[in-house]
């Protein structure tokens, strides 16, 4: 990913939308989206208009929606098996779930998003794009949909650091499936910081760091974690500083 961290930028006022012309990377769009390239263009337009107006996408992202968002997210398909079921956790305005669905008609995708404004946009977008047979939308936090939905792959971009994401996403992955998180340049640092969490959850396979997409700045770095076949345990959250000194029944009100 061009800026390396997988995190969308802050959302300034729509009044500062830049007017610069958008360059369409025609060959890449045709290669990645095939006969759905026109629908990808419609989605880009939705992000550039309603997405910006509703504060879901920063106006400065508009000139780079193709490279940094649609293509970048669609390349995730390179590490997802044919015919997989997918949950896109914290989908926001549909990233990476919608580009992935457009590029990979073989995948069945559920977008999970807690915020109402984003959830409404997602429902409108999948209707407008004719994706209702392939893409479902659920409103909720990862913790709320646990036990209700699961999939062979859970994707996430810019939702939380791995240390937190493991606890949110892995319980939604069926045994033998994977968490696939777009992480950009922070991948190795986040893996190191979250190693103990993974161990506590009983996940034994080492996370893989994979490059997807071409080496021209539109590709990105992905962390793939195998859920394994054993039971998943809850990770123990570290005690807040000073917690051990508190006496039971005194000053413990939340
Ligand atoms: C920075 S946005 C990223 C959106 C999108 N994935 C993208 O890359 O553009 C983070 C998203 O995660 C969602 N989110 C935050 N906490 C969550 C949770 N516990 N479970 C599911 N989604 C969550 C937010 O509502 C928000 O849409």
Swiss-Prot record:
This is Ribosomal RNA small subunit methyltransferase G. The keyword rRNA processing applies. It is an enzyme of class 2 (transferase). It comes from Kineococcus radiotolerans (strain ATCC BAA-149 / DSM 14245 / SRS30216). HAMAP family: 16SrRNA_methyltr_G. S-adenosyl-L-methionine binds at residues 90, 95, 142-143, 157. Residues 9-21 have a biased composition (Low complexity). The gene is rsmG. GO terms for cellular component: cytosol. The lineage of its organism: Bacteria, Bacillati, Actinomycetota, Actinomycetes, Kineosporiales.
């Amino acid at each position: 990913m061009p800026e390396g961290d997988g995190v969308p930028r802050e959302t300034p006022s729509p009044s500062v939308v830049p007017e610069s012309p958008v360059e369409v990377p025609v060959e890449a769009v045709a290669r990645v989206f095939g006969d759905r390239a026109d629908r990808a263009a419609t989605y880009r337009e939705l992000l550039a208009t309603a997405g910006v107006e509703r504060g879901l996408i920063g106006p400065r992202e508009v000139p780079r929606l193709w490279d940094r968002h649609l293509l970048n997210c669609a390349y995730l398909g390179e590490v997802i098996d044919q015919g997989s079921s997918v949950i896109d956790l914290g989908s926001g305005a549909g990233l990476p779930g919608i580009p992935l669905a457009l590029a990979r008609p073989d995948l069945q995708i559920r977008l999970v998003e807690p915020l109402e404004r984003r959830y409404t946009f997602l429902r409108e977008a999948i209707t407008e794009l004719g994706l209702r047979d392939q893409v479902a939308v659920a409103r909720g936090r990862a913790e709320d949909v646990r036990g209700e939905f699961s999939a062979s792959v859970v994707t996430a971009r810019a939702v939380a650091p791995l240390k937190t994401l493991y606890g949110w996403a892995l319980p939604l992955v069926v045994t033998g499936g994977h968490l696939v998180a777009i992480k950009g340049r922070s991948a190795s640092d986040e893996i190191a910081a979250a190693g103990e969490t993974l161990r506590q959850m009983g996940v034994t396979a080492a996370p893989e760091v994979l490059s997807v997409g071409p080496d021209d700045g539109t590709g990105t770095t992905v962390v793939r974690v195998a859920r394994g076949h054993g039971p998943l345990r809850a990770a123990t959250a570290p005690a807040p500083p000073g917690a051990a000194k508190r006496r039971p029944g005194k000053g413990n009100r939340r």
